[in-house]
Regions:
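Conserved class I S-adenosyl-L-methionine
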Residues: 2-56
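A short glycine-rich, Lys/Arg-flanked "PGG" loop and its adjoining helix->strand segment in the class I
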Residues: 139-151
Length: 170
């Protein structure tokens, strides 16, 4: 990501989880500003995550959850890389509304900081890009991800280094 608009990004890190975060992302969807900002910032999280995911998993038909899918940037990368069976979930309905058609099999709204209404052992893989950061998703969400995954599943996520240290992910 370039430093061009980093000042515009900093308010995200000052938010508290919950309605404040949802409202911020809802506002960010106006005129598709979120996707435009990701391009301007040269955000490579989705591509890098899927590159790592496919390095450790050769099966293209496993059931995957893109947790915190936003506008579908990771889903687009999954599809480009031949994956065929994945769902998307996000906290912001307005972000979900911007996901292109025919990317995900299912889209649903969830709060990753709460127990999610997904059965145990549902998924064989999870991607989670850009959600483990200040004011967003907290460490207990990892326990939920493990719960909804089958044994030996791959969970591939990005994490802001500051939150890794400050919130006790280590």
């Amino acid at each position: 990501m370039s430093q061009k608009d980093i000042g515009n990004k900093i308010p995200i890190y000052k938010l508290k989880a919950g309605k404040e975060v949802e409202d911020y992302y809802d506002e960010w969807t106006v005129q598709n500003k979120y996707d435009k900002d990701m391009v301007d910032w040269k955000y490579s999280g989705p591509q890098e995550t899927i590159d790592l995911f496919k390095k450790h998993n050769s099966k293209k038909d496993i059931k995957i959850l893109d947790a915190g899918c936003g506008t579908g940037l990771v889903g687009i990368e999954l599809k480009k890389n031949g994956f065929t069976n994945f769902d998307g979930a996000d906290f912001s309905q307005k972000m979900l509304n911007l996901v292109p058609e025919n990317i995900y099999q299912n889209l649903f709204k969830i709060d990753l900081n709460q127990k999610v209404k997904i059965k145990d052992n549902t998924y064989e893989g999870i991607t989670c890009v850009g959600t483990f950061t200040f004011g967003h998703v907290n460490p207990p969400a990892l326990d939920e991800m493990v719960r909804i995954c089958k044994n030996a599943s791959l969970i591939c996520f990005t994490i802001n280094i500051g939150i890794y240290e400050e919130y006790g992910f280590d």
